[in-house]
């Protein structure tokens, strides 16, 4: 029996994780659950799974949850509580599914404690990739990617990197793949959040629509698999059946295929190196429609281009880019800027922020805060 600390329990990854746990009650126990503000949903989850701990990042939400729970579940609050619970001696696996930079600290603490980190938080590597990977190695932690593309590469590379030419991450293209760029200015938040293949939270849905999500995954792949930017390719694949591919120098290509359902990836991370039932039906190739592949349009999806540029530039560029994107997406979801403004704000923030090398986690956090302040100031010009 493995104890799971699930960070981001009320999000899409959290829900899928619990769905897999439900299939294997003899193998997994929910030790701790966390959420940001959704205390009402947490009441239901606490009643069902009876974790030892429930953490609400928001203090008022924690108080409401504590008042509503009648069992002896310990309710904690704050980001620091997340850091503490992932290092608990009874935590075996950490599902790091908190969206955004706020999820970095707890994932890193789990790695320092030598836990299995099932990483769904891209920002941990985008912000502190070198530090994170060094920590994983130093403390003998296990790092299993919980992302359809990176899980695919992880599986395809099991035979080793000898003779590796490049990897290719697939991208659905989001809801606006065939929308003319002339119509981008009028795109609404609800339209941007209507992903054709995947059920996701609003922030990551917007990232998918701008293709910043794929840009973050490019950076993540760079750190996860120790690849140069030139070894990472992106292809548009609207059906989301081929999750990613590995190309070797002898002309061989290994791809991982499956129905687009995050439970497959989650079950793999939970059962690795074995496999177990995820609740997802197997892919029927005979009934699968034709598979399409396109080169991404970097003029149309500027965020993807900005991500590649930030990776090539190195230093603090990736941290600055991520911070500006999080701020811009927040304003877009609040109907305060247009969809087309998102890449403009990111680009302006990158141009304003001084480029430098960061050598510590404190410097990363400080750079993140400064970049957010700059992005806020830039957005005032768009009012």
UniProtKB/Swiss-Prot annotation:
One of its GO terms (molecular function) is NADPH binding. Keywords: Isoprene biosynthesis, Manganese, Metal-binding, NADP, Oxidoreductase. Pfam families: DXP_redisom_C, DXP_reductoisom, DXPR_C. Catalyzes the NADPH-dependent rearrangement and reduction of 1-deoxy-D-xylulose-5-phosphate (DXP) to 2-C-methyl-D-erythritol 4-phosphate (MEP). The keyword rRNA-binding does not apply. NADPH binds at residues 10-13, 38, 121, 123, 201. InterPro entries: DXP_reductoisomerase, DXP_reductoisomerase_C, DXP_reductoisomerase_N, DXPR_C, DXPR_C_sf, NAD(P)-bd_dom_sf. It catalyses: 2-C-methyl-D-erythritol 4-phosphate + NADP(+) = 1-deoxy-D-xylulose 5-phosphate + NADPH + H(+). Mn(2+) binds at residues 147, 149, 217. This is 1-deoxy-D-xylulose 5-phosphate reductoisomerase. SUPFAM superfamilies: 1-deoxy-D-xylulose-5-phosphate reductoisomerase, C-terminal domain (SSF69055), Glyceraldehyde-3-phosphate dehydrogenase-like, C-terminal domain (SSF55347), NAD(P)-binding Rossmann-fold domains (SSF51735). HAMAP family: DXP_reductoisom. The keyword Protein biosynthesis does not apply. The gene is dxr. It comes from Vesicomyosocius okutanii subsp. Calyptogena okutanii (strain HA).
């Amino acid at each position: 029996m493995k104890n799971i600390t699930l960070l981001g329990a009320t999000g899409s990854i959290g829900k899928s994780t619990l769905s897999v746990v439900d299939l294997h009650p003899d193998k997994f126990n929910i030790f701790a659950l966390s959420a940001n503000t959704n205390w009402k949903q947490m009441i239901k989850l606490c009643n069902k799974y009876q974790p030892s701990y429930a953490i609400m990042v928001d203090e008022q939400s924690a108080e409401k949850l504590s008042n509503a729970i009648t069992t002896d579940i310990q309710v904690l609050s704050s980001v620091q509580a997340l850091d503490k619970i992932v290092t608990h001696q009874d935590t075996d696996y950490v599902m790091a599914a908190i969206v955004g930079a706020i999820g970095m600290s707890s994932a890193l603490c789990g790695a320092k404690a030598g836990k299995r980190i099932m990483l769904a938080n891209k920002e941990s590597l985008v912000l502190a990739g070198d530090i994170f990977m060094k920590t994983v190695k130093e403390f003998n932690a296990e790092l299993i990617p919980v992302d359809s593309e990176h899980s695919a590469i992880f599986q395809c590379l099991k035979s080793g990197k000898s003779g590796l030419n490049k990897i290719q991450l697939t991208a659905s293209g989001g809801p606006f793949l065939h929308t003319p760029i002339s119509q981008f200015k009028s795109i609404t938040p609800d339209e941007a959040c209507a992903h054709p293949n995947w059920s996701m939270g609003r922030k990551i849905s917007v990232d998918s629509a701008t293709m910043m999500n794929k840009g973050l995954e490019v950076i993540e792949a760079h750190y996860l698999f120790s690849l140069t930017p030139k070894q990472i390719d992106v292809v548009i694949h609207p059906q989301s059946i081929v999750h990613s591919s590995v190309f070797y120098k002898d002309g061989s290509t290994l791809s991982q295929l499956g129905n687009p359902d995050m439970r497959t990836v989650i079950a793999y991370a939970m059962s690795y190196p074995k496999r177990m039932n995820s609740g997802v039906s197997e892919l029927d190739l005979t009934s699968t429609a034709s598979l399409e592949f396109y080169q991404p349009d970097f003029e149309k999806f500027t965020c993807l281009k900005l991500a590649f540029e930030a990776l090539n530039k190195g230093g603090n560029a990736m941290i600055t880019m991520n911070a500006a994107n999080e701020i811009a997406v927040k304003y877009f979801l609040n109907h305060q800027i247009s969809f087309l403004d998102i890449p403009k704000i990111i680009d302006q923030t990158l141009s304003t922020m001084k480029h430098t090398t960061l050598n510590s986690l404190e410097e990363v956090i400080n750079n993140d805060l400064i970049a957010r302040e700059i992005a806020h100031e830039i957005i005032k010009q768009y009012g």
